[in-house]
């Protein structure tokens, strides 16, 4: 009986494990697939991380070249997919990102206060506080949820459904889009140091902000981000 119960538990755990590792990339048109890219793995391509310690400056520069690198999306300069994770806040894991600030970094469509008034009114009914202006002329942005999920899967192996902090975000099932207010400030990470150990890879900028990465199945994923206390003074 114990053996049978053990086998059942094993099967259940196996199903859960497979399900957790087999998240499908959302269907995207070509221009959005190109936007998602894979800046982490591209940056580390050809870089030897087999030994613990600090990487050479030349390797760090190669990796850092993919950070804070504007992307031309249909003729508009936007934040690239990797940089969407950096908006001036720390997170202990990707599930802890502030979804509103993360989403507001994406390529988006701006709603017109006059032409889209009826739509805006409907969105505000869902979440009256989410679309309050934090400053004059702040814009309401519409962002494709599939694009958000694709970036999260690429860099963190999660989807936006896994994110816990969904305050100030309105989701519309009708068009599978997120609606958020634009961010008040811009932020960027520019690594100058890369440390390698057996458990993780740590990228630091010049004010000691830390991005930690892990490897799974030969691919790099974001583990956490710690914003330097000095960031407020920069």
Describe each model-derived feature in a short phrase.
Residues 208-234:
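Short beta-strand edge/turn micro-motifs at domain boundaries
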Residues 12-15:
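Short, linear, compositionally biased motifs with a strong N-terminal bias
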Residues 24-198:
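Flexible low-complexity loop/turn motifs enriched in small/helix-breaking residues
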Residues 1-9:
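Bacterial N-terminal signal peptides that target proteins for export
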Residues 17-20:
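C-terminal motif of bacterial Sec signal peptides marking the signal peptidase cleavage site
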Residues 22, 195, 232-234:
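Secreted/luminal cysteine- and crosslink-motif detector
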Residues 201-206:
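Short beta-strand segments that buttress and anchor functional surface loops
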């Amino acid at each position: 009986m114990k053996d049978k119960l053990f086998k059942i538990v094993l099967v259940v755990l196996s199903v859960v494990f497979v399900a957790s590792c087999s998240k499908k990339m959302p269907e995207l048109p070509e221009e959005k697939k190109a936007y998602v890219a894979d800046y982490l793995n591209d940056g580390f391509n050809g870089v030897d991380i087999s030994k613990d310690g600090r990487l050479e400056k030349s390797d760090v520069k190669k990796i850092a070249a993919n950070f804070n690198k504007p992307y031309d999306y249909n003729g508009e300069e936007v934040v690239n997919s990797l940089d969407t994770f950096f908006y001036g806040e720390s997170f202990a894991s990707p599930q802890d990102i502030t979804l509103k600030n993360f989403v507001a970094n994406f390529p988006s469509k701006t709603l017109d206060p006059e032409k889209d008034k009826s739509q805006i009114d409907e969105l505000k009914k869902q979440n009256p506080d989410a679309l309050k202006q934090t400053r004059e002329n702040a814009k309401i942005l519409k962002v494709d949820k599939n694009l958000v999920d694709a970036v999260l899967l690429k860099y963190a192996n999660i989807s936006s459904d896994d994110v816990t902090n969904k305050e100030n975000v309105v989701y519309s099932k009708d068009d599978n889009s997120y609606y958020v207010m634009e961010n008040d400030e811009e932020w960027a990470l520019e690594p100058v140091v890369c440390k390698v150990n057996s458990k993780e890879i740590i990228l630091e900028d010049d004010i000691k902000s830390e991005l930690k990465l892990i490897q799974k199945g030969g691919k790099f994923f974001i583990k956490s981000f710690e914003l330097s206390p000095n960031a407020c003074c920069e």
